[in-house]
Amino acid sequence: MDINLFDFHLPEELIAQVPLEERETSRLMVLDRETGDIEHKHFTDILSYLHEGDCLVLNETKVMPARLHGVKEDPGAHIEVLLLKQEEGDKWETLVKPAKRVKEGTVISFGEGKLKATCTGTADQGGRQLEFSYDGIFYEILDELGEMPLPPYIKETLEDRDRYQTVYAKEIGSAAAPTAGLHFTEELLEKLKQKGVELAFITLHVGLGTFRPVSADTIEEHHMHAEYYHMSEETAALLNRVKENGGRIITVGTTSTRTLETIATDHDGKLCAASGWTDIFMYPGYEFKAIDGLITNFHLPKSTLIMLVSAFANRDNVLHAYNEAVKEKYRFFSFGDAMFVASHAKMGNK
């Protein structure tokens, strides 16, 4: 399948550069995955589309301040490091710029020596394996020296790094935020619980592979980078209970979707406690086994994320919705607006 089938025209001014002042004030497009019908709402209207007995699945990963600026100890050139994945102990898979200046044995110093890294080898797609040395607690030092790893299409400086975290972020380990969750406030989540909507939490640590452009000409030639996921026995039991009682499982974001669909694929359609690495790639033709609805942002043209949404809601429906979003001047990408995609997605229906 040609990746150009997932292209659309996006004016640059619709790429959101900063988050809205209030998380929940973003717009919400509601898309019926069966009919392609569209409604234009605000995010707080999600309360009217979720019902007692439904379950929202949220990814509680926490973004690391994963971008570090350092200098080579000899001869002092500036090096930028982006942490991607912890391998074991203090060894990490990273991206470095400029990569040609970092060879095996190169030592990089950060924060006037508070943190040091030695290159121990190369990694996939031009990456580098670095082993860090420090006194103290690694994540405390990282919190002090690191910057939030905003996507390259965001040019503005982020004033408040908490705005690139969900309010329920807990398990540190992501190189990017699960952005569909950025719209929720603690108050909105509490209102959903009061309505009888269950909240279930999983973890998938987001790597840059999710956002890397598809370089192949056809979808089938593209391979996803693996990302770590975990679902507890408690969450699995809750999801199965919801299913048994006729409720819907609504994933918040493509990361939650990938986690549940990975587990269901690996366990004959069943949801159970599991941990591991997933490189699942969902595009039209994929048959969903676990989810009934999806809350997600508006994604990049020709990205694996728009392919996932197209697998769930039909490519023609999704591209029509995206063209409508452009026409109505929705905000796109990480700090942009949201979609709710489900069957019979009408306000107040059950």
From Swiss-Prot:
Gene3D superfamilies: QueA-like
GO biological-process terms attached to the record: queuosine biosynthetic process; tRNA wobble guanine modification
Taxonomic path: Bacteria, Bacillati, Bacillota, Bacilli, Bacillales
Protein name, as recorded: S-adenosylmethionine:tRNA ribosyltransferase-isomerase
Primary subcellular site in the record, as a coarse category: cytoplasm
Gene encoding the protein: queA
Function: Transfers and isomerizes the ribose moiety from AdoMet to the 7-aminomethyl group of 7-deazaguanine (preQ1-tRNA) to give epoxyqueuosine (oQ-tRNA).
Homology family: Belongs to the QueA family.
Keyword S-adenosyl-L-methionine annotated: yes
Highest taxon of the lineage: Bacteria
GO cellular component terms, A-Z: cytoplasm
Keyword entries, A-Z: Cytoplasm, Queuosine biosynthesis, S-adenosyl-L-methionine, Transferase
PANTHER family linked: S-ADENOSYLMETHIONINE:TRNA RIBOSYLTRANSFERASE-ISOMERASE (PTHR30307:SF0)
Molecular functions (GO terms): S-adenosylmethionine:tRNA ribosyltransferase-isomerase activity
Biochemical pathway: tRNA modification; tRNA-queuosine biosynthesis
Reactions this protein catalyses: 7-aminomethyl-7-carbaguanosine(34) in tRNA + S-adenosyl-L-methionine = epoxyqueuosine(34) in tRNA + adenine + L-methionine + 2 H(+)
